[in-house]
Each structure stands twice: as C-alpha cells, then as structure tokens.
C-alpha cells in the first residue's frame, strides 16, 4: 500500500475531498516524522510502537575482503506490533490463504 492508496482510502471511508484527505494524511505522517526525529516513542493503541534506538559505533568486517572497518554510531527505527495487531494478522491468515 502506498501513501496514495492511504489517501484514497481516507477519501472513500471518511467522505472528505481528495485534497482534504491528502492534507490530513500528510499532517499525520509529518507529525510522526517530527516526533521520531526528536527521538520520542510513538505508541498507537491496538497497532504498535515506533521506537528510535541509539546504536553505538562498533568494529565490523568487510565480508568481501575480511578487513576490519569502523561502523559509526547511528539511530535506527524499530517497530513493535501490538498483540491486537499480531492476533488480527494470524486470524486473517486463517481466513485467507497466502498468495
């Protein structure tokens, strides 16, 4: 599903104009992005948590040459689905066979 698909879904289900639906979806994504950039956790009840984690620098190895290289510190984004979402996914697997 793309952002355009999400906008279309909001347009169809809520009854806003396509322009209004697009603005709302953009605002939601902007808010999520800004919150994560500040390093804050996002908790969406019944869906899951987006968490920014700090990774320390470490020594790694180039798989082609075997040479040791320094991997710099960085921030990574993780997602932990809620139990509600996990259960919904498992139920939908029972109803619809995977393609």
Swiss-Prot record:
Similarity comment: family membership: Belongs to the bacterial histone-like protein family.
Coiled coil: none
Protein name stated in the entry: Integration host factor subunit alpha
Keyword Transcription regulation: yes
Example GO biological process: DNA recombination
Function: This protein is one of the two subunits of integration host factor, a specific DNA-binding protein that functions in genetic recombination as well as in transcriptional and translational control.
This protein's GO CC annotations: cytosol
Keywords: DNA recombination, DNA-binding, Transcription, Transcription regulation, Translation regulation
Organism from which the protein derives: Anaeromyxobacter sp. (strain Fw109-5)
Keyword hit for Heme: no
Recorded superkingdom: Bacteria
Matches recorded under Pfam families: Bac_DNA_binding
MF GO annotations: DNA binding; structural constituent of chromatin
Gene3D superfamilies referenced in this protein's UniProt entry, alphabetically: IHF-like DNA-binding proteins
InterPro entries reported in the protein's UniProt record: Hist_DNA-bd (IPR000119), Histone-like_DNA-bd_CS (IPR020816), IHF-like_DNA-bd_dom_sf (IPR010992), IHF_alpha (IPR005684)
Quaternary structure, from the entry: Heterodimer of an alpha and a beta chain.
